[in-house]
Amino acid sequence: MNQELLEILRKEVKPALGCTGPIGVCFGAAQAYDAIGGEIKRIVAKIDWGMASKIDDVAFPGTEMLGVEMAIALGAVCGDPKAGLEVLHNVTPEGEQKARKVAELVEVHPMWERKDMNIYICLLY
């Protein structure tokens, strides 16, 4: 039984850089931007309330950024989509400034979902 539990943990537990709810939003934004690319004009993120409801209280590693809009912008601008939940491993001060500018100048719109979505983050660019 202990071996079976260890196998499940090895398969399911992944390293994360930061709190997993907000980092999940960053990861979703990085994945979406990687798939679409180009100039960011608008980002709409449909986010499961239960996953990231306290996101405004959590700072992102290596930055002074807080909040869902910043999570979306930071993931889209600086996120490494191949890094999984360590998506922000390469954020620089310059990248942080670029993300702040995107959050300020571009329509970054979070939509909170309170029903069972069967997915946790849905981004539209």
Listing of model-derived features with the role each one plays in the protein:
Residues N118-Y120:
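C-terminal binding/interaction regions
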Residues P22-G38:
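Alpha-helical support elements that line or immediately flank enzyme active sites
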Residues M1-P22, E39-R42, I47-V58:
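N-terminal alpha-helical transmembrane segments of multi-pass membrane transport
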Residues K14, H89-V102:
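C-terminal catalytic/substrate-binding lobe primarily of soluble NAD(P)-dependent oxidoreductases
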